[in-house]
Amino acid sequence: MNSLEQAEDLKAFERRLTEYIHCLQPATGRWRMLLIVVSVCTATGAWNWLIDPETQKVSFFTSLWNHPFFTISCITLIGLFFAGIHKRVVAPSIIAARCRTVLAEYNMSCDDTGKLILKPRPHVQ
């Protein structure tokens, strides 16, 4: 394989990698927004739950029953984590990190957008 073919292969790989990472961005943004909204709802509900003087006087489950906003948002947040939202919000970073691991064997790397970074060849002495 000559250097021209190698350059074309690298360009094709880079183009496909950047395209793939770029296509993940909208979905990642939506997952991040969902996580932020549910986290803020949970924090707000937790604050209201904690400052309620009735919470200290009743049992734990009764206090949760008295604060359905907190209970539902907390269950939703836990459900999202079980569904893997923590992986979905960082999916492009995971892909880039895995590519960096593989590309390191070939003295290359890539940035978070998928652009290839060619490293100088190590000098063998």
Curated annotation (Swiss-Prot):
One of its GO terms (biological process) is protein localization to nucleus. The modification N-acetylmethionine is found at residue 1. The keyword Lipid metabolism applies. The keyword Acetylation applies. It comes from the Eukaryota. It is a multi-pass membrane protein. GO terms for cellular component: cytoplasm; cytosol; Nem1-Spo7 phosphatase complex; nuclear envelope; nuclear membrane. Muscle specific with lower expression in other metabolic tissues. Its main location: nucleus. It is found in: Nucleus membrane; Cytoplasm. Keywords: Acetylation, Cytoplasm, Lipid metabolism, Membrane, Nucleus, Transmembrane, Transmembrane helix. The chain crosses the membrane at residues 33-53, 65-85. Pfam families: Tmemb_18A (PF09771). GO terms for molecular function: protein phosphatase regulator activity. Interacts with CTDNEP1; the complex dephosphorylates LPIN1 and LPIN2. Forms with the serine/threonine protein phosphatase CTDNEP1 an active complex which dephosphorylates and may activate LPIN1 and LPIN2. LPIN1 and LPIN2 are phosphatidate phosphatases that catalyze the conversion of phosphatidic acid to diacylglycerol and control the metabolism of fatty acids at different levels. May indirectly modulate the lipid composition of nuclear and/or endoplasmic reticulum membranes and be required for proper nuclear membrane morphology and/or dynamics. May also indirectly regulate the production of lipid droplets and triacylglycerol. Belongs to the CNEP1R1 family. This is Nuclear envelope phosphatase-regulatory subunit 1.
